Curated annotation (Swiss-Prot):
Belongs to the FlgN family. GO terms for cellular component: cytoplasm. It comes from the Bacteria. Required for the efficient initiation of filament assembly. SUPFAM superfamilies: FlgN-like. One of its GO terms (biological process) is bacterial-type flagellum assembly. This is Putative flagella synthesis protein FlgN. It is found in: Cytoplasm.
Length: 135
């Protein structure tokens, strides 16, 4: 049972780390001068944490089968409390992710509008897959 508790604690820690990264990403997106490298570094860190989270989730599922106990772990108060924290953190992550998505979409829209207005009205200016301008 201690293995399951340790695994759930690790999942909780990873989720808190993801929360900090998403808040930092939001802050960077709101700044007017943020380099792409800063955003890409945050994305790399998120990918690493998601890989760890997937592995821990698989371990958790195996341990649940072994101990024959499943979420929300009502028979075990300690596990139940950790699980509630995980659920709350996941809800916060969902809100932060949606907020970041909205900010990125607005920035992209404003950049696209500026590029269209700054060039002649007959030329279409867009970004290609490499992030370079195409006219």
């Amino acid at each position: 049972m201690n293995n399951l508790i340790d695994t759930i604690k690790k999942i909780e820690n990873i989720l808190y780390s993801l929360e900090r990264i998403l808040k930092q990403e939001c802050h960077n997106l709101l700044k007017s001068k943020t380099s792409n490298e800063e955003i890409l570094e945050l994305i790399k860190r998120k990918k690493i944490l998601f890989k760890k989270l997937i592995i821990l989730s698989q371990d958790r599922l195996c341990l649940e089968k072994e101990y024959n106990i499943f979420p929300p772990y009502e028979s075990n108060n300690k596990l139940n409390n950790y699980w509630k924290k995980i659920i709350n953190t996941c809800l916060i992550l969902r809100k932060l992710n949606l907020k970041n998505k909205i900010i990125m979409n607005k920035k992209f829209y404003l950049n696209q509008r500026f590029l269209e207005l700054s060039s002649s009205y007959k030329k279409s200016v867009t970004y290609n897959l490499d992030g370079n301008l195409e006219i």
